[in-house]
Amino acid sequence: IWKSFTVISLVLLGIIFSIPSIIYNDDSDNWFLKNKINLGLDLQGGSYLLLEVQLDVLYQEELENFSDSIRLIARDNSAKINQIIVNENDIIVSFEDKNKINEIKNSFFQMYRSVSTQLEDNKLIIKIDDMYKKTIQDSAIKQSLEIVRKRIDESGTKEPLIQRSGKKRILLQLPGVKDPERIKELLGKTAKLTFHLVDDENTSALNANIAPFGKMIVNDIYDDNIKYLLNKRSLVGGENLVDAKGSFDQTEGHAVSFRFDTEGAQKFGKITSDNVGNRLAVVLDGVVITAPRINSPITGGSGIITGNFNAQDASDLAVLLRAGALPAPLEIVEERSVGAGLGADSIAAGKIAAVIGMVLVCLFMILIYGVFGALANVSLIANIFIIISLLGTIG
């Protein structure tokens, strides 16, 4: 009895849970009808995006890093720099005393062994050659693929196709996504989060809009007329985050709470302990979100980011921070909406073919094997329902 009851129950459950995949109502919000087999872009329709990683921005950042390194090396060697020119593929550093150039070049080479350098009179030329560019390119594309995948998964999109296309492009197919605006917003932000100390004392440099060495001037996210003079060196960044989620602050409204890993918690604790009374700016993609004053050490490894957020803004920012920062901005170079007209025809034709095939197989089994053939048909049909229900439930 128990064996029969178990078999009948499994078959009934298979029939019930296969219903969503058989009737396939794509627009239904019913939780039960959502448990259906996920169709691909060609059958279900959706969105097609082709993204291009802006590697030029990455190369420029690398050259800026070289420039900062040269300044530090020159200062350590008491060498005066006349001028630094940052071009598209190289930087040219002019020194007052050419006798110290070799020493500076060797020190720089110890830091960046794979970068090409050459001397011309009192100038040091640092180039990003093709080999170095390829290394940066491959690393950036690989990292971008991983982060795009995380962001898409966080958005709830099922069965996306994400793959590299060519040298610096990423192909993205999103079945069932009719309006990809939110996806585009999530992918359009680099989400590079850093924390910097605010220099409130050097008001003359801020008023003159000239950042001294080791400093940078950054706009407020909500008002371009508000500027901050920040220490250029990031004290801790988004790479140390292990969690972020939308939350609600009683005084500031919607916010994003975050938690650091062990290393980040130690850094953040030291920063807040050493700088009580100073302001700490939270910088996202080159603009200041908030710059609160440190009233007491924060040693628990967690904090909260406040701003003029609504619930969706806070949720999206949390998604971006959890997924991690893109190494370089992404540009949408091609966008298409794929209709499901062909898919609907294919599905309808497939259903008709399946029914005709099933009827013919059942007739053949009954004609050849009689009663045993009929029993085999029942088992076959039950098996089909169970497989469809499992595929729909698993997704």
Please report, for each region that a protein language model flagged, where it lies by residue.
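Hydrophobic alpha-helical transmembrane signal-anchor segments
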Residues: 1-45
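A short acidic/small-residue loop/turn micro-motif
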Residues: 296-298
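Short extracytoplasmic
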Residues: 31, 38-66
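Non-transmembrane, solvent-exposed regions of membrane trafficking/translocation machinery
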Residues: 55-90, 94-294
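Juxtamembrane "pre-transmembrane" interface segments
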Residues: 300, 312-355, 360
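Interfacial segments of transmembrane alpha-helices in multi-pass membrane proteins
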Residues: 1, 257, 261-276, 280-281, ...
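A short beta-strand structural signal in non-transmembrane regions
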Residues: 256-257, 302-308
